């Protein structure tokens, strides 16, 4: 298949926005794969701020970062992503160039603990305040469960209503696949 799958495309988008020395955000740590990916890009002079409400996600991400010798490039926060403005350093405004959200539940974790539309939208709004122009927020939306469908609808409504003078919004996904395949909403700050 020549078309890029959803998760590789999410990384392609992040690679176009995030450079060495930048700040990036992994708004849903999960098992730390995206955190490590971003930490490799930002290098020793940048920083990745990772958020998760689940202790096991913090632990898994810490282990993965240490195994790859990237732990010093990350700040892991055991709290909701909607607290990011209170966590980011004062010099973050204009230095955050990329952020990723994997909306849904922790792979292999408790499927009753899911991301919520209100905190997700609040975090997006906060990111748009501090992001550099042309910074990109990537939301990978898993909507194969009831809460995921509610969050999908809320995030799409929010994104569709963003002023085009503030941001460009892209939706990317395969529309003829079964079982509610994940799709991307990417928001590029203008």
Whereabouts are the PLM-identified features?
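Conserved beta-strand signature within the Rossmann-like core of class I S-adenosyl-L-methionine
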Residues: 28, 130-141
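A short glycine-rich, Lys/Arg-flanked "PGG" loop and its adjoining helix->strand segment in the class I
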Residues: 119-133
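Conserved SAM-binding motif I beta-strand of class I
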Residues: 47-52
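Class I S-adenosyl-L-methionine
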Residues: 148-190
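Helix-to-beta-strand junctions that scaffold the AdoMet/dcAdoMet cofactor pocket
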Residues: 19, 42-43, 131-133
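S-adenosyl-L-methionine
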Residues: 1-23, 27, 36, 40, 58-95
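Mobile active-site "lid"/loop adjacent to the S-adenosyl-L-methionine
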Residues: 101-122
